Amino acid sequence: VEWTDAERTAILTLWKKINIDEIGPCAMRRLLIVSPWTQRHFSTFGNISTNAAIMDNDLVAKHGSTVMGGLDRAIKNMDDIKGAYRELSKKHSDQLHVDPDNFRLLAECITLCVAGKFGPKEFTADVHEAWYKFLAAVTSALSRQYH
């Protein structure tokens, strides 16, 4: 992926403002509620059978924070996101058998939570465009090892 200076600045500036322990749980909860078929990958999380259970589940929140923390790898490797996620992609493909479309769904949830947090004055159309490109690069990298 090639980044313009404006895109790189928008992504890095936004990333510095993101609280992973707020956005991550928000996005993970939204994913499990809006796309309930994704719940099958989280059977070890205990009760996630209702929206209220998902909202109150500490393991859901913790995993959301972990996922958002994992985006830091892409931030630090913006010029080689595919390389940075090679092993994680392989794990999700070969061991966890995650449908790669779920990465896109989670990216949408992350974007919604970020937009809701920062609003249109900070999450402008230009910032949204750069953020979308960034998450598209991450989802592509995570999907790369699938056969």
From Swiss-Prot:
Gene3D superfamilies, per the entry: Globins
A UniProt-annotated Pfam family: Globin
Keywords: Heme, Iron, Metal-binding, Oxygen transport, Transport
GO molecular function, one term: peroxidase activity
Keyword Transferase found: no
Reported tissue expression: Red blood cells.
Function comment: Involved in oxygen transport from gills to the various peripheral tissues.
Assembly behavior: Heterotetramer of two alpha chains and two beta chains.
Family, similarity comment: Belongs to the globin family.
Protein's recorded name: Hemoglobin subunit beta-3
Organism: Muraena helena (Mediterranean moray)
